[in-house]
Amino acid sequence: MFAIFGTGGFGRELVGPAKAMLGSRAEGLVFVVDDPHGPVMGIPVISTDELSERDEVIVAIGDSALRQSVADRLKARPGALIAPTNIIGPDVEIGEGAVFCDFTMVTASARIGRHFQCNIYSYVAHDCVIGDFVTFAPRVCCNGNVHVGDAAYIGTGAVLKQGSSGKPLVIGRGAVVGMGAVVTKDVADGAVVVGNPARPLQRP
């Protein structure tokens, strides 16, 4: 079986690319949840207890901490969902559990961590290093020589300025880059930045 954990919006969005990727294996596509119910979009919904180590699963949860918590407890092995419209260039390493939605791209010599989610029309350019459990919302522009720390969230339409081989642009662990932000400088661990140019959000 190839299982999608979660029947929320993102999980349902992944049905199309999953079927396209699986081809003749698409009959084995299921949703998996902790408390199963009837079919969703014609896809069977099973319990986590029904998964085995022979099955593959991807976790369709946007929240990084929750995604990691679920991934760590599932018995099935992490799969990868790479939409047929995705383009992956040479010398690219992709970690287990990664999801590349339709019309995404990784150009060359990039390192992609475990359970990365790359939503529609986002790209990762040359020599980038993406950590584990990172989320890219739609239309993220991650230019060359950018390092993104574990569990960071990059919002819709954000632009990450190109770094250099000697000084990559760094997005810290657990940082949040707001939608439409233009990031020209490093972002600290756990920081929230918004705007153009992106600046730390002033909290009340």
Locations of regions flagged by a protein language model:
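Short glycine-rich anion-binding loops that position phosphate/pyrophosphate groups of nucleotides
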Residues: F10, G62-A65, R199
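Short amphipathic alpha-helical segments
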Residues: V15-P17, S69-R73, A188-D189
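Conserved acidic residues
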Residues: L29, D55, E96
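Phosphate-bearing ligand-interacting subdomains
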Residues: P36-I87
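Structural signal for interior beta-strand "rungs" in well-ordered beta-sheet cores
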Residues: L81-V194, A198-L201
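Hydrophobic, well-ordered beta-alpha structural blocks that scaffold small-molecule cofactor pockets
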Residues: M1-D49
